[in-house]
Amino acid sequence: MGDFGRGICFTELLGQEKAKKLILRSFATGRLPHAFLFKGPEGVGKQLFARGLAAALNCRDHDHPGACGSCVSCRKFRSGNHPDFMVISPEKGAIKIEQVRQMCQALSYPPYESDTRVVLLEDVHTMRAEAANSLLKTLEEPPTDNLLILTADSSREVLPTIISRCQVVPFHYLSEQDTVRILAEQPERPDPEAAHLLARLSEGSPGRAGLFLKTEMIGIMKKVISVIADPDLDGDRDPGTLLKTAEVMAELKENLPPFLGLLKIWLRDQLMLACDLPKRCGSEGLMQTGDAGRGKSRSLRQLFAGLQAVNRAEKELARNCNRTLVCEVLLFNL
C-alpha cells in the first residue's frame, strides 16, 4: 500500500477488526490511555494503523471518530509533515537510550498545534535495557496531552514492566483475500495467480508479501528449489551449481532471513505432503514446471534434517557469519 493505503484513517484499513473495535470503544468513551502497545506478527499493519490513529486523533472534523483526510491536520499527516507526530525507529537494529532521552525532552513541551501529540515507537522489542528503563519512567508518569503508541513483534520478548503500563491491542495475520487486495494496490501489482501465491506464502502478512514482490524473492526461490529438487545433482560431482546458487541467495543481503523463512515454508509443505496431511500453505506454486514430477523423493528424516539445516543457517546469520558461506553450507546440507 501507499503511506496510508486506502486512506489516512485506521478505520479504512483492511483487516484487524478487533483492534478497530478496541480503539473505537476508547474514542466513544473518551477514555484513551496514555500508551498503547500494538503487538502482533511482523508486516500486518501495526505501524500503518498507528499513523491512522494519530491522524484521527488530530483531525479537525469532529463529526466522526476517523480522519476526514482533507482538513489542515490530515493534509499534514498525508504529507508526513505534522509537527505533533513523532516516529522513533530502531537505529542499526535497536532503539537506543539517546533516542528515548530526546523523545522525553520533546514531551516536556506542549503540542505545537494539536490537542494531542502522538509518538510512535516502532519495534520496541529491539530496545536495549537502558533505553527501556528510561522509557519506563515516562510510562509511569506520562506527560499530559501526549499519547505513546508502541509496536512490537509478537514473536519477540517485551519487558513485562512495559507491557503492564500500556493498553495492549492484539494484531493478527490477515486473510488471504485481504492480503491479495492490498497487493493489488502496490505499484508492482502482481497478476492474480502470483498475488494469491504471495498471500499464501506470506501467511497473511502483507508487509512480508510486499517484500517478496519487491525483491523478486519468489523467482529466486524457484531457482533454488529447482536446484535442490534435481535428482541428477550430486554435490560431490557438481559443486559449481550449488556454489553459484549460494551466491544468488547471498545477494539478498539483509533480506536473506525472510528468504530462509520462505524455504522453511516449502520444506514444511513437503513434510506435510509426505505425511499425507492436508494443512499446507500451498507452496506448490514455487515448483518450476516439471519439478514436481521429477523432484527428489525425500524421507521424513531428510525433510526434518533440512528444516534443522535452515534453523542453523538462521542462527549463523544472527551471529553475523559470512552470508555466502552460510548459504553454501546450507545448500550442501539440503
Predicted regions and their residues:
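Conserved catalytic/switch belt of AAA+ P-loop NTPases
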Residues: 108, 133-150
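Charged, glycine-rich active-site and insertion segments that engage polyanionic ligands
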Residues: 1-55, 73-76, 144-145, 154-262, ...
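Clamp-loader machinery-focused feature within the broader ASCE/P-loop NTPase space
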Residues: 2-130
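Catalytic acidic motif of RecA-like/P-loop NTPases
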Residues: 122-128, 133-140, 156
